[in-house]
Amino acid sequence: MDKQTVLTTLNRIMELELAGVVRYTHYALMVYGYNRIPIVGWLEKNAEEGLAHARAAGELVTWLGGHPSLGLGPLLESHKHDIGDILRESLEHEGEALRAYYELLDLVREQDVRLEEYARDMIAQEIAHQDEVNKMLRRPGQTEPYTS
């Protein structure tokens, strides 16, 4: 196992998850309209989840003898705050995190069971989140998955 590449990937995951915390917090502040309360609650839950994911990645970094990053992943302010725009941006962000977890899995497969199980668990969580957002982007009665 290339420990330095694993540490770099874990730090990138941590940065992406922390960017998600900022992103979801911002989105929660920008929701207006009749459905504001449940949507804000959902966005705040995602911010809390992102912080937990960042902490988990950071713990792995330190367990491996590395130094957790103070950086943040990319933050794109589109100035679009329609719920549909927020969900599409969320889907894109989650896809980037999912790719990073798959990259980690490829690096540690059959070399470190703890990191492999961590990566698999996070992949399952990210896929479930993408599926949830995908359903939210569908029109009422639409059963086919949303495609951009």
Each predicted region: which residue ranges?
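Iron-associated oxidoreductase/ferritin-like identity signal
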Residues: 1-148
